[in-house]
């Protein structure tokens, strides 16, 4: 994972269908320019303005490019659950802030059998990051609200929480194939799928 923080995830939630369509076209063309032209012209993003289509495409491309070639190739045979989990993985790999929120807050709660995320959990996390991350120091209240709103929508659409209202934690169910793809990439990302250290060691013994 890149050590820098990127907050442009506010431009697009999980966008499961749209991201999958982009990946399919990229695997067909093997060329980002051709993929972009198709996606914009066919309005895969389902946005009225061309500028909005381009903005969302840039964000989805950034996410897709974070995946390994092996992970991308697996989309050809992946189940709907695998597709969702791999697209969520792309988000975790792209946005350090989201990854850290899950590992530093959600995983700790989950391991303590506390299965509901409170607004105060997020607010405490955000405050702890606000003065450590340059991009957050002088953001507006509106941007701060949107960062939170879109983050929880991503978690909901990833089926990581039951809803943005209740925020009950749901541990993702990963296929053996996806577990192996993550382990061969970077086993640390399994933490964001709520794997314990013990479970991660077992995965490493099996696949690495």
Residues of each region from the PLM?
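Short, solvent-exposed secondary-structure capping/transition elements
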Residues: 69-73, 110-115, 133-136
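Leucine-rich, amphipathic alpha-helical/linker segments
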Residues: 9-12, 16-29, 91-92, 96, ...
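Accessory, usually C-terminal, subdomains that scaffold auxiliary metal cofactors
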Residues: 137-208
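Short capping segments at the starts of secondary-structure elements
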Residues: 30, 114-117
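Eukaryotic partner-binding/assembly regions in large regulatory complexes
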Residues: 1-85
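Amphipathic alpha-helical interaction surfaces
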Residues: 63-66, 104, 108, 128-132, ...
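Positively charged, polyanion-binding regions of nucleic-acid-associated proteins
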Residues: 86-89, 93-115
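DNA-recognition alpha helix
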Residues: 118-132
């Amino acid at each position: 994972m890149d050590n820098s923080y990127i907050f442009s995830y506010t431009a697009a939630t999980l966008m499961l269908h749209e991201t999958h369509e982009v990946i399919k076209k990229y695997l067909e063309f093997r060329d980002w320019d051709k993929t972009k032209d198709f996606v914009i012209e066919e309005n895969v993003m389902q946005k009225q303005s061309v500028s909005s289509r381009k903005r969302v495409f840039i964000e989805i491309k950034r996410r897709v490019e974070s995946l390994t070639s092996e992970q991308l190739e697996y989309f050809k045979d992946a189940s709907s659950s695998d597709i969702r989990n791999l697209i969520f993985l792309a988000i975790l790999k792209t946005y350090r802030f989201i990854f850290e929120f899950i590992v530093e807050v959600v995983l700790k709660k989950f391991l303590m059998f506390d299965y509901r995320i409170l607004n105060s959990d997020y607010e405490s996390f955000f405050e702890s990051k606000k003065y450590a991350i340059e991009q957050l120091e002088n953001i507006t209240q509106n941007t701060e609200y949107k960062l939170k709103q879109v983050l929880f929508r991503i978690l909901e659409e990833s089926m990581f929480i039951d809803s943005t209202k209740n925020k009950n934690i749901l541990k993702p169910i990963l296929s053996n194939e996806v577990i192996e793809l993550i382990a061969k990439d970077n086993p640390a990302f399994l933490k964001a799928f709520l794997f314990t250290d013990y479970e991660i060691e077992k995965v490493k013994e099996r696949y690495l």
